[in-house]
């Protein structure tokens, strides 16, 4: 199943703590999805009153830095597996008070996504277009980045290359 990493950072004297690579209330606890999310270890609140921020990211990894976590999309996304492996999801639930309920973390896709439509025209009839061997390449795209796990910002790094999109 899919795996996400969860960090939990407690508030101190009512003020949000700062996410760190280690030393948080919980550091990068793997949660695996089957029919529901299952943590690799039991997780408990610090006490009955201390609020916490919950940080979630996908896919699960072993970040040595939470402010510049390296991630690379596949330049060849022609297969569904490579396309899906190029997705990065991040989310936060801020200021959560201790509760016996599950903590809900809203997540977002932080990498770019593009939908390309090709259609007949300019010398192509529907029939000739359908018979043509058409390929698409997206040029001048940086496929490497760092993700700041504390705020979800992404910074492109490295050289630009060509990406073959999923069809």
Predicted stretch roles:
Residues 146-167:
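Intrinsically disordered, low-complexity terminal/linker regions enriched in Pro/Ser/Gly
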